[in-house]
């Protein structure tokens, strides 16, 4: 049985804003504390995989060194791109373009920010990355340091959920879910 623990990065510097694959802030001091606390009780991983973005990669590199584990960075597992909204605060967008902001929250599949990555394309690349981890580590226990969007896509994969429900899920900074590939397919484990 293959297991992947998906760990969302900790709080980044710069506050709450649209931070996709175009804004690469490092972790804040609090973000580092969140990450170390999240992994304090677990060390049975056989491999670490990370998004190449700093808020994931820098912690993954340090943890892999500390645990003497192999590390891979996979660009398929970077955050979804938010186009023109990258780096902007929610309030700023809501005030500047309330119609687009509301349309996005009502139907994020068909009302993407200008220049944003299409949600179906994002899901396809994350799905490919997750399945590759399962294929490359058929008996392994992999830690994947990633983003909220990647966790949403992984949840949608496991539960065969429509992309229209994508933004109804939330995982806090340094929050974690687990996927297992079994005879039944990919299973989602919460609160392991």
Language-model segments: which ranges?
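Phosphate-handling substructures
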Residues: 66-125, 187-190
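Active-site signature of alpha/beta-hydrolase-fold catalytic machinery across serine-
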Residues: 62, 153-157
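Active-site-proximal alpha-helix that buttresses catalytic centers in soluble enzyme cores
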Residues: 4-69
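Acidic, low-complexity terminal tails and accessory targeting/binding regions
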Residues: 1-3, 38, 80-92, 135, ...
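Short basic (Lys/Arg) and small-residue
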Residues: 147
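Generic structural signal for well-ordered alpha-helical scaffold segments
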Residues: 36-40, 123, 127-135
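Short, active-site-adjacent cap segments at secondary-structure transitions
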Residues: 13, 55-57, 79-81, 150-152
